[in-house]
Design a protein with these regions (language model features):
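Blade/loop signatures of beta-propeller domains
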Residues: 21-32
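Surface-exposed loop and turn segments in beta-propeller and other repeat-based domains
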Residues: 31-42, 93-102, 149-151, 211-233, ...
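Beta-strand-rich domains and repeat architectures in extracellular enzymes and scaffolds
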Residues: 32-78, 241
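Blade-loop segments of beta-propeller domains
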Residues: 45-49, 67, 73-125, 286
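Blade-terminus and WD-like Trp-Asp/Gly-His loop motifs, strongest in beta-propeller folds
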Residues: 50-60, 100-126, 156-165, 170, ...
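Short, conserved, GDST-rich strand-edge loop motifs in beta-rich repeat architectures
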Residues: 63-77, 121-126, 168-198, 253-266, ...
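Beta-propeller blade signature
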Residues: 77-86, 132-141, 194-208, 266-275, ...
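Conserved blade-ending motifs and adjacent loop-strand segments that build the rim/top face
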Residues: 283-288, 321-333, 363-370
Length: 370
């Protein structure tokens, strides 16, 4: 089955049946961007500004692969390309990567400091298995920097909105403990320990390349055991390292007991300041794919509602839209860089739907099923 990239173009139209007459409707235009025998996709869901478009909107990032119905083989590269919308959606193939998976792609991020021409993606040395992050310049058509660390070969897990840093994680550990979010045969330097003190979330200065360990698995293990001394696991891993819009706090999940491993199943939401202070474990779980709004607010789920959760107060402080608008509030959600357009993507009867809400005037639309 052919896989294509498509985009939704957003505009404004009249009134929406079933809602208040004063509520404007957002119109959608769907345009197919790619075709052919290969699969084309961007990767992640748009959380925390993982955006396909460059600053001007002319170029759209993507990956080209042969198979999307399984995890890639270790020697199976994906082609990095951009779609040039100014040249009749021409595909411009740029590079290749051996660090990708069907769920998250290769963690594309446009560089916030040069969002017109530079972007990040992950790669892996096929000989050593070491993962690293690439900064690529579209104008120069080459890699302008590679963030390689022999002692802790990490890949990008989230770029700060101010372009100052990115969060790095051990994708080899993910390949072992949560395969669908890892890279097959990526080196896992901490595999011999269930809660190593030399692994966890790293923060990397984009300008200098200097890295430091923000929080270790050992710290997280100790924090978990302070809450429950009886907890047992065969190894912790971290998913969804999400930097807030001020670039001074991260929200993430520490997990264990997934993918058939023995022990207690752990799924603990955590937050920490980027200076390493304020590590907090949160009792309130607001869904597996939350999104940062303004300040210290996260968008997530409580029951049937799309809600705002205050990380400082550790409680729900508001609601976004209605259950009628967002029937699956734990769907894949994203908030635009200006924090105005909110999108909830969800599945129903084997079709994907996208509910789009504009916060400034409550305009709303739901896409057809794909």
């Amino acid at each position: 089955m052919m896989k294509v990239l498509a985009v939704l173009f957003v505009g404004v139209l009249g009134c929406l049946k079933g809602y208040a007459e004063k509520t404007p409707l957002i119109s959608l235009k769907v345009e197919q961007l790619t075709s052919g025998k290969k699969h084309h996709f961007f990767g992640y869901i748009g959380q925390c500004q993982t955006i396909p478009w460059n600053a001007s909107g002319r170029y759209v990032l993507g990956l080209e692969i042969d198979r999307i119905d399984r995890m890639p083989n270790p020697d199976e590269a994906s082609t990095v390309f951009v779609i040039d919308t100014g040249q009749n959606n021409k595909i411009v193939r740029l590079d290749k990567t051996h660090a990708w998976n069907p769920q998250q792609g290769t963690m594309f991020y446009w560089n916030p400091l040069k969002a017109e021409t530079q972007f990040f993606f992950n790669d892996r040395d096929v000989k050593t298995g070491k993962v690293f992050t690439v900064l690529y310049d579209l104008e120069k058509k080459k890699r302008v920097h590679e963030y390689r660390y022999d002692d802790s070969p990490i890949g990008n897990g989230g770029v700060a909105a101010d372009g100052s840093a990115f969060l790095g994680i051990n994708y080899g550990r993910l390949a072992r403990l949560r395969l669908v979010t890892g890279y097959p045969e990526a080196l896992d330097w901490s595999r011999d320990e269930i809660a190593p003190k030399n692994d966890g979330i790293f923060i990397v200065d984009i300008k200098t390349g200097k890295k430091r360990l923000l929080v270790s698995y050992r710290q997280l293990d100790e924090a978990l055991k302070q809450r429950n001394p009886e907890i047992k696991h065969r190894g912790l891993f971290i998913n969804h390292t999400l930097l807030n819009r001020k670039s001074d706090r991260a929200y993430f999940f520490v997990r264990g007991g997934w993918s058939g491993t023995k022990g207690d199943k752990i799924n603990m939401p955590c937050s920490i300041h980027t200076d390493g202070s304020g590590l907090t474990l949160h009792d309130k779980h607001i869904g597996g794919h939350p999104e940062w709004a303004e300040g210290n607010l996260l968008i997530g789920r409580q029951g049937d509602n799309q809600i705002f959760y205050d990380v400082d107060k550790k409680k729900v402080v508001g609601q976004l839209g209605t259950p009628e608008m967002f029937p699956k509030p734990e769907g894949d959600i994203s908030l635009s860089p200006n924090a105005d357009l909110f999108v909830n993507g969800y599945k129903k009867n084997n079709n994907n739907y996208y509910a789009i809400y504009r916060r400034s005037d409550s305009a709303f639309v739901r896409s057809k099923g794909f």
